[in-house]
């Protein structure tokens, strides 16, 4: 499990005190070590500590329902695509820095990943389960490494499947 803990790493920095690495290793990495790589990547990508660590909780599609909401305009808090998690998914978890992706591929994968966030619990600033929030998901088709993904919840699973089957992933 030590290898996978380094491959799908998170840290106790930022607000991750309660999103501890121990819980992450126990609940996600160790629980999936006997699964195939695609399952491991999917489970690690959609794990609440990884979503928090790589800021996908802040990944809101500008054209999404939430992104176009009046309160964002009133409070001057525009919705933004957060590329951090998408870049790490390609660069560190699947196809490597030499995988042939472009900055546009990172942006498009980040759009695929919009809407995935922890389920918040009332009175607390974090959650322990993950949900897909359609209101925060960027609508429309996205193209990553030449493959087109429809809008919606299934996009992340299809994108991960394509990334783990990419020739660069096998070499990485």
Residues of each region from the PLM?
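Active-site substrate-binding loop specific to GH73 endo-beta-N-acetylglucosaminidase modules
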Residues: 18-172
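Peptidoglycan glycan-strand catalytic modules in the bacterial/periplasmic cell-wall system
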Residues: 1, 5-14, 21-28
């Amino acid at each position: 499990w030590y290898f996978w803990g380094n491959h799908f790493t998170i840290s106790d920095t930022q607000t991750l005190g309660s999103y501890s690495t121990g819980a992450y290793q126990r609940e996600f990495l160790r629980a999936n070590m006997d699964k195939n790589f695609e399952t491991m990547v999917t489970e690690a990508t959609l794990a609440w500590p990884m979503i928090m660590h790589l800021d996908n909780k802040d990944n809101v599609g500008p054209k999404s329902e939430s992104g176009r909401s009046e309160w964002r305009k009133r409070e001057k808090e525009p919705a933004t695509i957060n590329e951090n998690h998408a870049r790490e998914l390609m660069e560190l978890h699947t196809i490597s820095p030499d995988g042939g992706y472009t900055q546009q591929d990172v942006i498009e994968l980040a759009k695929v990943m919009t809407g995935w966030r922890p389920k918040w619990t009332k009175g607390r600033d974090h959650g322990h389960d993950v949900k897909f929030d359609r209101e925060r998901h960027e609508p429309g088709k996205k193209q990553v490494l030449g493959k087109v993904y429809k809008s919606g919840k299934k996009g992340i699973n299809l994108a991960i499947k394509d990334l783990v089957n990419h020739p660069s992933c096998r070499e990485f």
